[in-house]
Amino acid sequence: MPDRRTLLICSCEDTMPLAAAAFERGCRGADIVSGRQLCRAELERVRSLMVSGARITIGCTQEAPLFREIAAESGSDVSFVNIRESAGWSAEAAKAGPKMAALVAAAAVPMPDVPFTQIESAGVALVYGRDERAIEASSLLKEHLDITALITRPDNLMPPRTTEFPIVKGTIRAAKGCLGAFEIIVDDYASPRPSSRGALIFGPARDGAVSHCDILLDVSGGPPLFPAADLRDGYLRADPGDRAAVLAAVLRARDLVGSFDKPRYVTFTADLCAHSRSQIVGCRRCLDLCPTSAIAPAGDHVAIDEKICAGCGQCAAACPTGAAGYALPPADVLMRKLRTLLTVYRDAGGVSPILLIHDEDHGGALIDALARHGDGLPANALPLNVNEVTQIGLETIAAAFAYGAAAVRLILRAKPRHDLAGLYNTIALAEPILAGVGLSGERLATIETDDPLALGEALPRSARKQRSRRQGP
């Protein structure tokens, strides 16, 4: 354990076993407190421990908001880890004690504060569309945002009885920026004549009009204005034929006013960058991999726009010099957590661990659903939650096997939100290295699915294969 802590583990009303012996073997030096219903009937036990000033790790994430309220009263240092869906709710729960101990120990590894950059939005919004649907969306937002509607094909568009927001015509030729700082270039730009009667009639048009806005709502039905459009903060896109999707985008746009703290996902040391010297281009890895085009050449090095960066981490994973480093968490902290997870699992009696790397929104949700509606994870599948699976580089994969992993699986979406070329390149580089040290076969692979039951079907096969290899000559 990184420091002496009190571990609170709960059987959740006897729906999962608690292997006390495994916790004692794996979490030496920690005070282990077990319960049956710590969030309700035994809540005062939790409160008294928090008042005592103990550092506490609670094996429950479902009731974390309640426990945080109590911790705030006493200023207690508390962290949380999911051992129920990750281990306890499983067809192999009886053998999951070592995994539970490993998950709790890894959760106690101290995490550094997340660095942030601030984004300001004054609520100036442009609704870009092709017909009345854009006007309807603008009308829903007019009381909340400073709205302008830009229509690409304003044929037979009824003039409003009262001009409550500007309606102009034009086609966006180019767009750049992000929440609070969009810049668009519009061709065929024109304003309507105030004398328009049966339909809006527009004045003389011009190309190259420039406009700035904080929020860009795109209901044009055309191609996205940005690469990896779903990752561009402040750019909301919906199919104009899907009223529910348009309404959802409107509701999201309404909330994008004020100051926002965005994580600074990547740290960058320009002096280490090998992009260019004497006007001769050397390394382009990050430029070629960035899905949002947040990276651009800047002389002998590159520059990363932290407000556009969506945090995929492929630049840091591919950087050959360490100029770009991932910050959520930094690589050395992730290594400590990985080492703790695998060594405690072994110390607690676990064998043949399969490291299951996943993000929270997708992989975490699949694991949760598999536990609730399927057989749960195998006892030797150790989930490691990271910010983005694509942040994983060769050093993490090598460390996982060095610390004792029998296999590594990376959970990905069936339809990724951005190109995964960087991750695939890392896997292709790692495979011959693993084979060279005798780790051949399906040691490293992705599981690309949005179906929790498909995840469940993939993992037991992996578990059986790795166990059979370990038992072989």
Give the location of each predicted region.
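Flanking helices and flexible, charged tails adjoining ferredoxin-like Fe-S electron-transfer domains
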Residues: Q118, A249-R252, D271, H275, ...
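Iron-sulfur cluster-binding cysteine motifs and their immediate structural context
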Residues: M50, K142-D146, V281-D305, Q314-V333
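Ferredoxin-type iron-sulfur electron-transfer modules and their immediate structural context
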Residues: P2-L289, S293, S352-D368, L384, ...
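Residue-level detector of anion-binding/catalytic polar loops
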Residues: D77, I147, G325, A406-A407
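Structured core of small recognition/catalytic domains
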Residues: R153-K176, I184, P320-A324, P329, ...
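Short, structured secondary-structure boundary patches
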Residues: I167-K169, L338-L342, D347-G350, T426-L434
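C-terminal, active-site-flanking charged/polar segments
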Residues: G393, A399-L410, P416-V437
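Active-site phosphate/pyrophosphate-binding segments
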Residues: I308
